[in-house]
Design a protein with these regions (language model features):
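Multi-pass alpha-helical transmembrane bundle typical of ion/small-solute transporters
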Residues: 1-341
Length: 341
């Protein structure tokens, strides 16, 4: 086995590690509300989310994978060291923010780290501006859209069930929240499941294992082991690390009842369905946080713990530049030992 093959295997394993930490960090968003409302136990919620994350891989196509793999940086100017540095940089940032209990975006950590390593190797000219434009716009738009939809849905539910007995409403939405949690998990899988595949395709192209033509046409033809491995890694990550972020998302921002959980998840799911179809790698964290804030604000503004929300916003702002710096430092370290990297 030659060095190039070993390096590709290491890259794929790191990509699966990133998926694990994505589950560790991001997939908890899929179950935060259904757990905080006590509709499902954390363990059952993880299984529920994992099933629909897996199904999503076959529903939404690979538009997001194409954006991540070929739409953010010029792949003709990167190397295997860039891909490795990007993956490790994203993982390091995810571990740090998980430890701090901050629900930042693994998606934005990945693209920030990937870009940071690419810039460290080839300068700012390696960036593809139009690929970044829609992503940066939706850093702002996604949580606002989630918040507006959450506010609208919650207001509508209050009006529709204004004369119903609270215990009957609670019982109904405990059942409906299983559907909304499934829908949100589908949206999460549709946006996140393809990101690692895009990175793997970029790594194969950077190492010359696939041609430019194969790289540009490979998005609909990923092998089953890659799909299964990516989803399994994400599910395991959710199982082992999800609750720390679930606690912040589901209870520290605002108190939720089943009706609120249903509205937040539905608002988040609609946002994720739309962006996945458009190939925009939005943050599931940003989306569900905005939806939870929108739902909580229908009670009264003081129902939202704005101090916690403010810390989350600062984490959002820092994610892309911080992960980029971490990855750039890693790349420069590699280049110190291997000037041709």
């Amino acid at each position: 086995m030659d060095n190039a093959t070993i390096l590709v295997i290491v890259t794929i394993l790191l990509a699966l590690c990133f998926d694990f930490f994505n589950g560790f960090h991001d997939a908890a968003n899929s179950i935060a509300t259904v757990v905080s409302t006590r509709v499902l136990s954390p363990r059952l919620a993880v299984v529920w989310a994992a099933i629909f994350n897996f199904i999503a891989a076959f529903i939404f196509g690979t538009a997001v994978a194409k954006t991540i793999g070929a739409g953010m940086v010029d792949v003709n100017r990167i190397s295997q060291a860039v891909v490795l540095s990007g993956l490790v940089g994203a993982i390091v940032w995810d571990i740090l923010t998980w430890w701090w209990g901050l629900p930042t975006s693994s998606s934005h950590a990945l693209i920030g780290a990937y870009a940071g390593a690419a810039i460290a190797r080839a300068g700012f000219g390696v960036i593809i501006p139009h690929g970044w434009t829609k992503t940066l716009i939706f850093i702002v738009v996604a949580p606002i859209l989630g918040m507006i939809l959450g506010l609208i849905f919650m207001t509508a539910m209050f009006w529709i069930f204004r004369n119903s007995a609270p215990q009957n409403v609670d019982a109904l939405f405990r059942r409906l929240q299983l559907l909304s949690a499934a829908a949100y998990s589908l949206g999460h899988g549709g946006n996140d499941a393809q990101k690692t595949m895009g990175i793997i395709a970029g790594a194969l192209y950077a190492d010359g294992i696939i041609t430019k033509h194969e790289f540009s046409t490979t998005w609909g033809h990923f092998h089953w082991p890659i799909i299964l491995g990516a989803n399994l890694a994400m599910g395991l990550g959710t199982y082992f690390g999800g609750w720390r972020i679930v606690h912040t998302m589901g209870s520290k921002i605002t108190k939720l009842k089943p009706i609120g959980g249903f509205c937040a998840e539905t608002a988040g799911a609609i946002t994720l369905f739309t962006t996945a179809a458009a190939g925009i790698p939005v943050s599931t964290t940003h989306t569900i946080t905005g939806a939870i804030v929108g739902v909580g604000s229908t009670q009264r503004l003081s129902a939202v713990r704005w101090g916690v929300a403010g810390k989350i916003v600062w984490a959002w702002i820092l994610t892309i530049p911080a992960s980029a710096l971490v990855a750039a430092a890693l790349f420069w370290t590699i280049r110190w030992f291997n000037p041709s990297a």
